[in-house]
């Protein structure tokens, strides 16, 4: 059975969403392990804040890149389907 563009796109979208959710869950677990802020020196508190911000920025960049790759794969798949259609039904 042939896969349609809609099926392929839906699967990539679902995988992107699942991966983003897993990344967010991992970040939450990681951030939950942070010591109580009242026990941290101002320097360590600043360090943790910078580190958390950096992790979130990298997560966001990674998720954006994953989405860009998915969009590229969708376009390539659509192109392949069009080529296949043209090969099967020339002149249509």
Curated annotation (Swiss-Prot):
<keyword id="KW-0963">Cytoplasm</keyword>
<dbReference type="GO" id="GO:0005737">
    <property type="term" value="C:cytoplasm"/>
</dbReference>
<dbReference type="GO" id="GO:0044409">
    <property type="term" value="P:symbiont entry into host"/>
</dbReference>
<dbReference type="GO" id="GO:0006952">
    <property type="term" value="P:defense response"/>
</dbReference>
<dbReference type="GO" id="GO:0060285">
    <property type="term" value="P:cilium-dependent cell motility"/>
</dbReference>
<keyword id="KW-0206">Cytoskeleton</keyword>
<dbReference type="GO" id="GO:0015630">
    <property type="term" value="C:microtubule cytoskeleton"/>
</dbReference>
<comment type="similarity">
    <text>Belongs to the KMP-11 family.</text>
</comment>
<dbReference type="GO" id="GO:0005874">
    <property type="term" value="C:microtubule"/>
</dbReference>
<keyword id="KW-0493">Microtubule</keyword>
<comment type="subunit">
    <text>Monomer.</text>
</comment>
<dbReference type="GO" id="GO:0008284">
    <property type="term" value="P:positive regulation of cell population proliferation"/>
</dbReference>
<dbReference type="Pfam" id="PF03037">
    <property type="entry name" value="KMP11"/>
</dbReference>
<protein>
    <recommendedName>
        <fullName>Kinetoplastid membrane protein 11</fullName>
    </recommendedName>
</protein>
<dbReference type="InterPro" id="IPR004132">
    <property type="entry name" value="KMP11"/>
</dbReference>
<comment type="function">
    <text>May be involved in the regulation of the cytoskeleton through interaction with the subpellicular microtubules. May be involved in parasite mobility and attachment to the surface of the host cell. Behaves as a strong immunogen during infection.</text>
</comment>
<dbReference type="GO" id="GO:0007010">
    <property type="term" value="P:cytoskeleton organization"/>
</dbReference>
């Amino acid at each position: 059975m042939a896969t349609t563009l809609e099926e392929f796109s839906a699967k990539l979208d679902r995988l992107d969403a699942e991966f983003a959710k897993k990344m967010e869950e991992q970040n939450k677990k990681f951030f939950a392990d942070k010591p109580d802020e009242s026990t941290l020196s101002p320097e360590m508190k600043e360090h943790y804040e910078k580190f958390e911000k950096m992790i979130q920025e990298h997560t966001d960049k990674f998720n954006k890149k994953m989405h860009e790759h998915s969009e590229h794969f969708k376009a390539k798949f659509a192109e392949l389907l069009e080529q296949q259609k043209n090969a099967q039904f020339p002149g249509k």
